[in-house]
Amino acid sequence: MKSMRMVGALICLGVLVAGCGGTQELLRPTRSDKLYEAVTARGSQLVSVIDSRSHSTDRRLPLGVPTGDWRHIYSIVSTSLIDTDPQTGATRSSIQLQGTYQLPPATANGLPGGLSPNGQWLVVEAFDGSANGMPSSTHMLVIDTTTSRVWRKIDLGGYFRFDAVSNDGDRLYLIQHLNGKEYYVRLYDVIGGKLDDNIVVDKSDGNQAMVGTRLSGVATPDGHWLFSMYVREHESPFIHALSLDGPYAFCLDLPGHGYVDSGAEMHWSLAINRDGSRLYAVNPATGAVAVISPGANDAPAVLRTARFDKAMSVAGSASAANAAVVSADGATLVVGGPAGIAWIDTASLRVRAHALADWSVSSLGLSPGEQNLYAIGDDGRIAVISMATTSVSAKFDPAEGRPMSLMRVAAA
């Protein structure tokens, strides 16, 4: 029974010698990008905005959930919801939540979520404790970000976690925890103010209760589907394809094993192409890649899978947020993992290049014009790689803290 638990285009010309313990550079880029990196530093989580050319930090922002256009980043400080302008660090607005709420986690390593795909609706959550450790009741606020007002307050008996909210704000999808492992996916009617009596089931086999650990998720550009990457203790990984238009979902099995049997299963990443016509699930630690049809006019389905040479090492972080990107033309899938970076041709699903074989890469990001690929290592170092030649043009350490994710790359 399937189940889920939340648990630049510069060519390297040579090597410049750096002083002992200093930054090692190959060639300082002539153009500059701004890297928005989520880090943990001195007990706090924040977003450091790093200049790729000077290697200096321009500003630090509170860690939060950004809108797709990156005009807003929402965070919670004490009992206030703060709307910050990521471009300047200035506070756009602040509202009192009348209680202690938190942003729902979107990834296994704690990146915040809670936004609808279009950024109009934000859900925050709070819980009442109980003697057995599992919360006895759940409280949620649905906030209209266009007016900065609480639109609905939701109180439920039992332990529920946010899964997704539709673009119109009418449908809220929740994870109802039954015990320490099993749970249901439930649909909450925001307008009617009640849980749908029916459980959101896997339409491929009718299963209701789910188990597994969610690693990350990606929504289609049109906001109709949410795809979440799940791994299980003793069974193969799968993608949970949740329709945001109704009470149904599909579970798409992937090749592999349980993460208790193989820790390499924790290195799955998801990436979707620009028009949303293809989703890729890839694991460089096991050497597996799958192509998925997101189901614009049909049910989502795994179209094909392939194997490639897996990483020789499976050390490194097993809690990265996501480490895969697709080029704008859809021809190349790039994935990072415990043995560097691999470039995969999406037509043949064959690896055509490697880089940073001695790095454990936890996150990737493409520059706006796709001249450069930026890679974040588990140790906090950043590498700049030419997408055209796959050569490394620079490496530096911003010394900002323990990396969580490269959330955004923007032109300077």
Model-derived features: positions:
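C-terminal motif of bacterial Sec signal peptides marking the signal peptidase cleavage site
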Residues: 17-19
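An edge-strand/N-cap motif at the start of beta-rich repeat modules
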Residues: 23-62, 68-74
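Repeated scaffold domains used in trafficking and secretory/extracellular systems
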Residues: 23-28, 60-72, 100-115, 158-166, ...
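Short coil/turn segments that connect the beta-strands within blades of beta-propeller domains
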Residues: 33-35, 70-71, 118-120, 168-170, ...
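Blade-level signature of beta-propeller repeat domains, shared across WD40, Kelch, NHL, RCC1
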Residues: 375-412
